[in-house]
């Protein structure tokens, strides 16, 4: 697997993609990118604003372009948005242009990690657990479909998970 130069992290909200990605990039001396941060940088607004103004569909169009651009780079670790996996184009780009690591976590951990985060538009509802369960039912099979490696993140620090990824990839 080591012939691919990019590492792409996929998984649900609260799996630790951004935090683990930063550790992984630092440990491997690679550039780190976060697709949500790149969208915010390009629009000059936060994700919640993009959702409010353009809706989820408008956000997904932006996300598809950002992921297409970032996956063309070499020598990067990319943390993708949790919903990016729903796009066939994004799945194809991730699979073709790097190693895909699925960061798996439980609904309980997702709830605990995201409950105070107001920057997650899909969770600004009365029952975020129900939303997370519905998203998992749709998205988890897609994460599994393109994953080269699956790593559980529930009870471990970001640094430990980053080390596990490095071990599994043989770096």
Swiss-Prot record:
Coiled coil: none annotated. It catalyses: shikimate + ATP = 3-phosphoshikimate + ADP + H(+). Its EC number is 2.7.1.71. The lineage of its organism: Bacteria, Pseudomonadati, Pseudomonadota, Gammaproteobacteria, Alteromonadales. Substrate binds at residues 36, 60, 82, 139. InterPro entries: P-loop_NTPase (IPR027417), Shikimate/glucono_kinase (IPR031322), Shikimate_kinase/TSH1 (IPR000623), Shikimate_kinase_CS (IPR023000). Its cofactor is Mg(2+). Keywords: Amino-acid biosynthesis, Aromatic amino acid biosynthesis, ATP-binding, Cytoplasm, Kinase, Magnesium, Metal-binding, Nucleotide-binding, Transferase. It comes from Shewanella sediminis (strain HAW-EB3). This is Shikimate kinase. Belongs to the shikimate kinase family.
């Amino acid at each position: 697997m080591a012939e691919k130069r990019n590492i792409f992290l996929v998984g649900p909200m609260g799996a630790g993609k951004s935090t683990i990605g930063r550790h992984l990039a630092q440990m491997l001396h690679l550039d780190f990118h976060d697709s949500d941060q790149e969208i915010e940088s390009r629009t000059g607004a936060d994700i919640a604003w993009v959702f409010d103004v353009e809706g989820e569909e408008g956000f997904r169009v932006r996300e598809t372009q950002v992921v297409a651009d970032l996956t063309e780079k070499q020598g990067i670790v990319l943390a993708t948005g949790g919903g990016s996996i729903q796009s066939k184009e994004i799945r194809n780009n991730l699979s073709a242009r790097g190693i895909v690591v699925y960061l798996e976590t439980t609904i309980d951990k997702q709830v605990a990690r995201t409950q105070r985060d107001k920057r997650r538009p899909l969770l600004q509802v009365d029952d975020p657990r129900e939303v997370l369960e519905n998203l998992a039912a749709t998205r988890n099979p897609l994460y599994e479909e393109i994953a080269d490696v699956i790593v559980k993140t529930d009870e471990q620090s970001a640094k430990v998970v980053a080390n596990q990824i490095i071990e599994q990839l043989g770096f």
